[in-house]
Amino acid sequence: MSIYVNNGALGAMEHTGTAASALALSVPVAAGALLLKTESLLGIGAALMLLTALALAFLGGAALARWQPLRKRPALAMLRYGFLLAAAGWLLTLLMLFGGHDWPALLAGIALGGLGQGVAYRTAVGEKRALTVAHRLTTVVSIVAVGVAALLVQTYAAPGVRGSCFALALLVDLTLLGALMARVAERDGA
């Protein structure tokens, strides 16, 4: 019986973990702020339903990352796939919103985005690592910065739906940045 421990990936995961967990947590918070901001376009009931779907999908993604068959995969690969799934979801949301579709069409993209962000966050934080003060501070600052940036882009880029699309494009970019960071850390560890 042999036991294989991939120490290189664990070291790279520690280095990437704070930035990745901050990105994985700040993007859904910014998406939630955008959903609340687009309440005038969608209606308060639809905005609250989409916000609830986002929260449930994020929690579902975090639970999915704890699933035994997925825990056997390398952590950096799971982190990358979580970010890529989230980017696909936010891009689908962006396309549906830009296409002028009503709120039920946004549901699939928001669910995929939240699911991917939940997987990425749970993978980045890890099983037993407690949040340190610096980690918490980095996460809070990132959440505020991404939320403010998304709301400023939505407000000043273009009024109405187009501003929301630009702000969602920012979230897609940040999610792809997380996937790229995971891939670079994975290549450095190999």
Q: Which positions does each model-derived feature cover?
A:
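Short amphipathic helix-loop junctions that connect adjacent transmembrane helices
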Residues: V27-A46
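Structural signature of the two symmetry-related core transmembrane helices
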Residues: A77-L91
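A late C-terminal transmembrane helix in Major Facilitator Superfamily
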Residues: V133-L151
